[in-house]
């Protein structure tokens, strides 16, 4: 239904952001 569609869109929107944040913060953690 619409709820599933909304959740899917939200996941698609947040996933790339999480990957970018992970790429930024992971080297910082490993560096320190």
From Swiss-Prot:
Entry's transmembrane regions: none
InterPro entries membership: Calcitonin/adrenomedullin (IPR021116), IAPP (IPR000443)
One term of GO molecular function: hormone activity
Subcellular location: Secreted
Biological processes per GO annotation: amylin receptor signaling pathway
Gene Ontology CC annotations of this record: extracellular region
UniProt key word Hydrolase: no
UniProtKB keywords: Amyloid, Hormone, Secreted
Family: Belongs to the calcitonin family.
UniProt function note: Amylin/IAPP is a glucoregulatory peptide hormone that plays an important role in the regulation of energy homeostasis. Selectively inhibits insulin-stimulated glucose utilization and glycogen deposition in muscle, while not affecting adipocyte glucose metabolism. IAPP function is mediated by the CALCR-RAMPs (AMYRs) receptor complexes. Amylin can also bind CALCR receptor in the absence of RAMPs, although it is more selective for AMYRs.
Self-association state and partner proteins as the record states: Can form homodimers. Interacts with IDE and INS. Interaction with INS inhibits homodimerization and fibril formation.
Domain notes: The mature protein is largely unstructured in the absence of a cognate ligand.
Protein name according to UniProt: Islet amyloid polypeptide
The encoding gene: IAPP
């Amino acid at each position: 239904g619409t709820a599933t569609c909304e959740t899917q869109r939200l996941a698609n929107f947040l996933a790339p952001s999480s990957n970018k944040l992970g790429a930024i913060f992971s080297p910082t953690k490993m560096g320190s």
